[in-house]
Amino acid sequence: MASPNGGVTTYDYDDSDSAAPVRAQTIEELHSLQRKAAATAKDSASPLQSISASLASTAREYGPNLVKGDPEAKGAPPAPVKHQQAAAAAAIAASDSSLKFTHVLYNLSPAELYEQAFGQKKSSFITSTGALATLSGAKTGRSPRDKRVVKDDTTAQELWWGKGSPNIEMDERQFVINRERALDFLNSLDKVYVNDQFLNWDPENRIKVRIITSRAYHALFMHNMCIRPTEEELETFGTPDFTIYNAGEFPANRYANYMTSSTSINISLARREMVILGTQYAGEMKKGLFGVMHYLMPKRGILSLHSGCNMGKEGDVALFFGLSGTGKTTLSTDHNRLLIGDDEHCWSDNGVSNIEGGCYAKCIDLSKEKEPDIWNAITFGTVLENVVFNERTREVDYADKSITENTRAAYPIEFIPNAKIPCVGPHPKNVILLACDAYGVLPPVSKLNLAQTMYHFISGYTAIVAGTEDGVKEPTATFSACFGAAFIMYHPTKYAAMLAEKMQKYGRTGWLVNTGWSGGRYGVGNRIKLPYTRKIIDAIHSGELLTANYKKTEVFGLEIPTEINGVPSEILDPVNTWTDKAAYKETLLKLAGLFKNNFEVFASYKIGDDNSLTEQILAAGPNF
């Protein structure tokens, strides 16, 4: 504003946007000012000794020279850390790798990992919603035939080997050879990504895991999928209980013993280590750790489960078991209930707990209308794996299968609005076994006694329809023991015995819910409507079905309710929905025969310490 002052006009200038020049002589100094220093705990060198020990060669018995931070960062380099045994061993095991420093990027934030991913691979992009879209390379799914578990004196007796088992053996020597191959690759890099995180939300039974990988996207994936530690927890993290060496960018030697391809996923339970070679599919890390939990938790008397889990407002918890396509994720995600987890859980004397800190959702044909929670979770921090997007707008086309049908999104569970944090709950009230029966002969819902629950849990049944491209329309039965045979370590009857013990101890109810077909098999009948299935699940949660009237079906001997609010009574007994009763009986007997044939491999095993329970379970199958 102008004002007279002795004939001189003065002005009050608005200089609110003026400031002193920056205290920087170069653009690098300006950039360093832009990034405020992290907390002192993150700058501590204390984890480097432990990480160097993790990266130690078995032959040389010492780890690489490590320095914390990005080698491309400007400014004074951090002080290097050498493994404490390096000086003594260097004289006898000198190598070029011992003369260089490996930079450790330790527990980076999502924003930092985004920047690393963009600088590292041409296949990393930001989508229109802020997610990180990336590619897993030639492998777009797990490679179960390339997974190996070390068979030693202990595991030879403990683990499930042979027909039907997912555990394919290798010896300790070949594991060490593959471990050295992975370490040589990782230690040759200028930088590696290291995550120290936890598994299991139950604080009394959590496991410390360390993931060492060459790709930023893998580090972000595990940041999302494992439980994220606080700064205080990182300061006292110490030595991990289990370590993953992900050298998936480097191939295995296909001509080595026990190898069948250039891909190899190896687990040594004695060493508490996992080695990945020749595959960059991130799901190998997630499911590898799940297998480890299937080994470690039962040793503590804790049942590990491949299931979804949610909790009602009154604290009533339900477990959902089911193979792919049965509706496990859809039905466990309920806006009227809190989500404890969508895939991996533990059941201990403390109740249930989620193993993971995130969700790994399928994205194929994803829509906002059908799966709003997953749709909205795909935002900044989420990893989108192998999706296709518009080159200009970066909008994802979830229907596009050009790369793979197994498109995935990995995000922290906090991205789901009704997630229960911490992800723990009381003992389950209901155990729900889901089956998508494409034969159309199982009832929409059946109440199971204990023996029937164990029989169907061990069977792990669903049915799929062959692809139309080969002209086959006959349904194919799929059996996966404990609804997760690919990941279990012990014989299925061990997990069944633990489930039976907990259901008896806490008085829980088992249910078999068919989310498949009614009125005929696939191609003849119709898929049971999702609203009807939701009404059935609601009736289970509310306790309505505990007081319902029941009748027993033939062959399978299942107890089915005569009526449920909101569900047509005529569909509750599958025989009523078939116009061709003879075809129904023929199909029913066919499925019963498939169940019997599948269960023969388990018939000679004792389930728990109760001989009578074993006999009851064997008698709980179809009778014809």
UniProtKB/Swiss-Prot annotation:
The keyword Lyase applies. One of its GO terms (molecular function) is phosphoenolpyruvate carboxykinase (ATP) activity. GO terms for biological process: gluconeogenesis. Its main location: cytoplasm. Its EC number is 4.1.1.49. Belongs to the phosphoenolpyruvate carboxykinase (ATP) family. This is Phosphoenolpyruvate carboxykinase (ATP) 1.
